[in-house]
């Protein structure tokens, strides 16, 4: 025959290499029996072998095995069989994957491929070996004791391959949290140093002084092209959302099963669905629990359900009787099924920008890709929209790698296009539904207001400025600031207006004056909380006004407003609908009119203070405040409370300035000596700053002068005493000694006189009058 048999390490593993010879199954025979069968075979000799492509390192075990045939006996060389025998064993399977068992695979019929594909030195094989993708991963450890969580391994069955591979990534480790290193990756460099064997890799990774470790890993590029990364799948499936899962699952279960050649439908009922009820089709979203599966989405409520599709999609094509646990893998459920099942009910006409040809081509490419990936090239029939059921032609003259590259390129292009189209469609539908909901809400409020008898009108509480907006340059009176939301405080004590108006709801509008925020009050069904959403579309408002607020009612028809978090801020206050009419008072308090009859004609000016029952309305205890947007020096904005008094004073100052300016051209008549001068707020600030600086300057001068005098006193010597002063001091000392001797007090000296030195004689007192 011109070739030698390969030697397997274990004779009982012979079935892993050679499957059939001239249609006779050899998987259960020993090596000697296989050799005898080869010798006894007649020409032409057709041998079916099992080979694993070397470019699928690191892939899951369900893709490591591919079934190929040789054309004639001279196309298989000894070197090729030896290379197949030296391939490393498959990597450990993932937790949710089951390895293929050859006995569970469907029977293999003869296939003929290009013999040049199996030559060891062929250009395609060399090209495949070089199709590697390199990625640099940097892992950071918090301390030296932390482990990366990588189990490195090397090959023992091939001396030429000295590469270091990642055998396992421990869950909840640093490498697993990073997510870029996967099982089967080859480690090329560690911290910029090439590693040749396992000892070098372990030595570098276990160094205690290294906390940041940079790894250069390589993996087959086709592995990344065949399967989506988890991040890409999540990003793509986020566009569809979880709301279409129920519709997608029902659509897949309703699709008719696909016919299949062979007896691989064993164990599955004829005509029934390909999967049991307990098994769920994986659409790539990753939802497994019932609570998430039954969850409803707001977008699903708005967009509505699409009609179920009866077109065969890859979601239904997957169910061709393979019910064994060995075939229940994540990669077997192709991720693009969600896209096709979603668009199957739409058709190419409902996707603007995607023609019918592109749509059908996209489906066909995905189906081909699914079948090629999972080794099910034979016996698969799929339906096309243009021409019913037709068999998939698998006798291709071009190589599998070239075909897969073309498929990947076209799939990426169409996938990107479909993603953008579907995203734009969903956004457009969402906008339309929101617009309809807003219009229905507004119409219901208008109808509610029109149906009620119009007993009275309650205007919003606002302040009439002293001047019109067009004549004022105040920041408080500009168009935008007048629309600022007023402060909401506790309602007024119950009045006849409120008692008579209970149960009635009106739309409060201000027919004139500056625009103010309106509070919508409706009457929903009793016992149910009012929860709705209002979308502001007034271009003059310039900002979104409010979202929803829960209004809970007690049995005594009392209204409690519940605010959570930032909703308590009046800057973010909301529209209210209540069963009773609620009264608000804003920046400036406005008391209710005298009677209900005078409500429409009551004066709203600040000068005429309304009275109730002849008694003036009670003033607000707390100072009236309002919200104002302030700007910091760095340009950022913040909201602060400011008393209304500041705004009134500023408006008064502007009015005074306008009255005093431009009256005459006589400089003497408008001089500050006669008219006085009004200092603005900025000028008063400058005055305070200058006064503070002058006071500091005076204090500094006084302190300097005192220090100077103190230095002069300490530096000069004691001055010499004058002789006259010394004589005077001595005389006074003698005199005092005579008068105040023996502790004679002044009173005694004045009353009784002075004693003599010996104490025997007493002189006349000083106050006695004598004549000479």
UniProtKB/Swiss-Prot annotation:
Q: Where is this region: Disordered?
A: 239-320, 450-573
Comp. bias intervals (Basic and acidic residues): 287-303, 452-472, 535-552
- Residue ranges annotated as compositionally biased, kind Polar residues, are 473-484, 502-511
Q: Answer yes or no on keyword Iron.
A: no
Q: Which InterPro entries match?
A: E3_ubiquitin-PDZ_ligase, PDZ, PDZ_sf
Pfam families on file: PDZ
Coiled-coil spans are 394-424
GO CC terms:
cell cortex
Task: Provide the alphabetized UniProt keywords.
Answer: Coiled coil, Cytoplasm, Phosphoprotein
Superkingdom field: Eukaryota
Q: Where in the cell is it found?
A: Cytoplasm, Cell cortex
**Which SUPFAM superfamilies does the annotation name?**
PDZ domain-like
Keyword Cytoplasm present in the record's keywords: the answer is: yes
Q: Which PROSITE patterns does the entry link to?
A: PDZ
Phosphoserine, modified sites: 242, 459
**Protein name per UniProt:** PDZ domain-containing protein 4
